[in-house]
Amino acid sequence: MATNAIDTWTDSVRTTSQSYEDSVLGLKQRRADALEKFAQVGFPGRKHEEWRYTPLTSIASSPCSAVLERSETLLDRNLLPVDSNGVARIVIDNGEFRDDLSDLSAVGDHVQVQSLASMRREHPEQLSELLARSFPADDHPFHCLSDALLDDGVFIDVAPMSDVDGEVASIHIIHYLDGSRGPGSAHTTGLLRISKGARIRLIEEIHCQGEVLGNIRWGVDLAEGSDVHRIR
């Protein structure tokens, strides 16, 4: 990718990244390292096997996609199911965990969910450790963007549903990417910790309106005897 285009992206990402106030060195250093790596490697190109048939030239050569704010149209889209049918629901709106629209009643206390934004404020050391364990340092361009622009996301902590072998916790995750007010980006980090013997089924659904760079990543910490089934 052209160096000047990557420099433009790097400068824009740096400005946004510096607006997030991190209280612990681990998070600050992770942002700084990610930004430095992104400046070095840029976006993936055809030499990267997973992107060989998905050229990103138009993204890399365009102005940096601003991080989108909470949508004003999500509720108008009728995306939320009326009946849960025994499935919990997590809503992520332009990268922001929406506790007000999520419903975990189907899984009770067996699944604990917390926004990464609240963890950044209240438990920054724990978040730093979870990120380090889930996403060891690498030079994947989109992981670098996720680290540099980490603001919100979701941490899902799963315990066994019961003493009955094989019982599965089912969670419907709805991502809404809304670029109706103008093009932009949404960077979502999901952290999943599954205790010994726990089983979970994730049903992930993505809706997009307008032009949005949706950057979604999941880090999974599986204990012995646990299981995760992801449907996307």
What are these regions (language model features)?
Residues 1-232:
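Glycine-rich and polybasic anion-binding loops at the starts of cofactor/ligand-binding domains
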